[in-house]
Amino acid sequence: MTTRKCNKFRKTSESEISLSLNLDGEGKSNIDTGIGFLNHMLNLMTKHGFLDLDIKAIGDLEVDAHHTVEDIGIVLGKALKEALGNKEKIKRYGTCFLPMDESLAFVSIDISGRAFLVYNCEFTVDKVGDMDTELVEEFLRAFAFNSEITLHTKILYGKNNHHMIEAIFKALGRAIKEAVLIDEKIKGVMSTKGII
């Protein structure tokens, strides 16, 4: 099987990000974004997705975390797209309902080549740890649009905002794991068009 790995580096006036992704990993991560809560969420996503992910990010956190979070989503999305190559034999779709104590999250993805985000998540606080809760949507949008996937996410219910966000990231990891699985029964790509 072709190695499905990608290394990316992106530098702007707002952030500098180096990233290494292995789709066929063991759930190992080495993540330093400068944002403790985001580190925690990406570690969880990596573990549940059986990805190997290294990220070193330096951003303008003296402004706020927006640029750094969004730019990590951009780089991770581009890395996923590149690591998938021609997308032959991948299952394409991945869906996960994931409970975290009192919270339940739903994530479904389609590695379609069509970038789209449906985001139905509401939080009751502005910040969890050192990250604004509104940045969850910014991260997911940047990730979906740069990986060219369709991504639906919804919080069905919950009270603890940490638990709700944690459920999203764990579910995202599991949905990615399912969608990128190789199925030898698939001839070419999982589309009657012959391309995704």
UniProtKB/Swiss-Prot annotation:
It comes from Clostridium novyi (strain NT). This is Imidazoleglycerol-phosphate dehydratase. Keywords: Amino-acid biosynthesis, Cytoplasm, Histidine biosynthesis, Lyase. Its EC number is 4.2.1.19. Disulfide bonds: none annotated. It comes from the Bacteria. InterPro entries: IGPD_sf (IPR038494), ImidazoleglycerolP_deHydtase (IPR000807), ImidazoleglycerP_deHydtase_CS (IPR020565), Ribosomal_Su5_D2-typ_SF (IPR020568). The gene is hisB. Belongs to the imidazoleglycerol-phosphate dehydratase family.
